[in-house]
Swiss-Prot record:
Single GO term (MF): 6,7-dimethyl-8-ribityllumazine synthase activity
Classification via PANTHER family: 6,7-DIMETHYL-8-RIBITYLLUMAZINE SYNTHASE (PTHR21058:SF0), 6,7-DIMETHYL-8-RIBITYLLUMAZINE SYNTHASE DMRL SYNTHASE LUMAZINE SYNTHASE (PTHR21058)
InterPro entries assigned: LS, LS/RS, LS/RS_sf
Residue numbers annotated as active site: 87 (proton donor)
Name of this protein: 6,7-dimethyl-8-ribityllumazine synthase
Pfam families in UniProt: DMRL_synthase
Reactions catalysed: (2S)-2-hydroxy-3-oxobutyl phosphate + 5-amino-6-(D-ribitylamino)uracil = 6,7-dimethyl-8-(1-D-ribityl)lumazine + phosphate + 2 H2O + H(+)
Native organism: Corynebacterium glutamicum (strain ATCC 13032 / DSM 20300 / JCM 1318 / BCRC 11384 / CCUG 27702 / LMG 3730 / NBRC 12168 / NCIMB 10025 / NRRL B-2784 / 534)
UniProt pathway annotation: Cofactor biosynthesis; riboflavin biosynthesis; riboflavin from 2-hydroxy-3-oxobutyl phosphate and 5-amino-6-(D-ribitylamino)uracil: step 1/2
Length: 159
């Protein structure tokens, strides 16, 4: 099962943090669920959450990069389901590399909630819907907020 080995993670107190959520519109039902759960988790943690939508996963990095300049953290959400061509690999690699580069270049946490699955059923199982085994939208938000808090602590003590 996919949850095996995951650390126990609690919703952090993110009061005062500003986080953006950028969500792709492809695979709308899945992405809308990821988006709702990420936004709900951010607000429940006390963060100020702003919301943005883009067409697809390839458009995520450029918008995330712009938002990383003005936010404590950014969450990128999308869903790429494998098809019959190599396009899946190109999209997944480009998005993952882009989001990682942005996080490193800006020192801003980027929660990567872009699902990369072989089937739509796998995406549904990870999107936090009824019967899901995981909730990658909320998990990406918690990871981004937690990392922003760690960076804030480091900057305050190393300052």
């Amino acid at each position: 099962m996919a949850k095996e080995g995951l650390p126990a993670v609690e919703l952090p107190d993110a009061s005062g943090l500003k986080v953006a959520v950028v969500t792709a519109r492809w695979n709308a039902e899945i992405c809308d669920r990821l988006h709702k759960h990420a936004v709900d988790a951010g607000r429940a943690a006390g963060a100020t959450v702003s919301e943005y939508r883009v067409i697809g996963a390839l458009e995520l990095p450029v918008v995330v990069q712009e938002l990383a300049r003005t936010h404590d953290a950014v969450v990128a959400l999308g869903c790429v389901v494998r098809g019959g061509t190599p396009h899946f690999d190109y999209v997944c690699d480009s998005v993952t590399e882009g989001l990682t580069r942005i996080a490193l270049d800006t020192s801003t946490p980027i929660g990567n909630g872009v699902l990369t699955t072989n089937t739509e059923e796998q995406a549904v199982e990870r999107s936090g819907g009824e019967g899901s085994v995981e909730d990658k939208g909320a998990e990406a938000m918690v990871a981004a907020l937690d990392t922003a808090l760690v960076l804030s602590q480091i900057r305050a003590t190393e300052g």
